[in-house]
């Protein structure tokens, strides 16, 4: 990110110079006095002045943080992430191995006779090791399954994935990449807790999920960035842009091995911090002209995408204006109101400069001032209707999942190479935060996506942490050609035939110019967990092309 920041600073210095206007001379001009000698300022001096102004601005922001949260430095921990213990499995244990170097070496002729790479991207450092998983071994689902690792051999990074074919028509149904957020939480959590083929009960037993999203699509569950879930590395990833290169490589090598899926529609879906990931990952894919990834849309659930538009809605959601009773007392609500202007000023500084020195203070101050009061109540930040129980993530089911995925038999069946599994790696969470990634304006990538593919933003309306009010606000504020018509579009009912055979309104939707927003009633942060039938209903409708305009 240093080169990006430097580019912005240099741009600021150049833009600060005076503009020259050429005017027609008036008739019969008066004699002009001799001009004063013009002092031409050294451009490097202008650049130094710009750095000084930015340094002073960053210093003021840090002073604000230290004044308001004086113990913050004592809570900071080193950014190093302990390496996981692992045992590399021999190549003979893998069903397929795809070499990125082999793919990068392929050249083809275009219609004009010019040679170009068959597949774009720097792939030579990557391999994909794939294991065919015996469906009867774990009893998760009867469909064809694959697991394995993407290896970045140049940087000692190894990303784990688990793939399930569609229960319906695997050679006709779309393929979906699912990403959990955090940052630092395993997508296997989403698989077993929300939308995958099975859940894990208190007896640490797998139970069939009739509302799995692989009912009508094939799904790749990916543990990313490295050191999340079953993934591992001696290196650390601390920002979303770096992670995008790995995801592009994995998908490219996967579709190279499984050509039967590469012609089918492909979609990226995820929740929470995937509101950061998905715009970047989709942009990385669409950046390449010669690719075997047939990206058709993206879906972001209860995401964090545009903090400047979303953070003003923490107070309304916590204080009774989001459709549920207030969680906080009037004094706490007023405190959040008082803190908001300073918070927004800090986020704007982050947006303007996009450096750690402005984005990190914004994260620290705003999260303490606007999320902290809610967390102190003991209520579930992922569902305002409940208290937080079971563990730090408020759901005891996550403990069952962790215990299941640490079983030696499970790890052996999947070809896992690490010694243990954890659902969320808080060191990674802290690393992204301390590198300023949390507050960065990744929503600015969405307009270019909308020019090529549909984008769905959905939100369970009982979530606090990435609430529906904020998600609706940022979509309505997004600057793109369809902005005005989307903002004024009315909300319409979402309906389905429920399990009792009755017509049920489960949410509301607005859509225009490839952008769609959905509010899902009576669902929290993990929408498919709270509303499994409704989630499958809107997912199937979306993947089949409803609300798409491109």
Swiss-Prot record:
It holds the Pfam family Peptidase_S10. It comes from Paracoccidioides brasiliensis (strain Pb18). This is Carboxypeptidase Y homolog A. It is an enzyme of class 3 (hydrolase). The active site is at 272, 463, 525. The gene is CPYA. Its main location: other. Gene3D superfamilies: 1.10.287.410, alpha/beta hydrolase. Residues 19-131 form a propeptide.
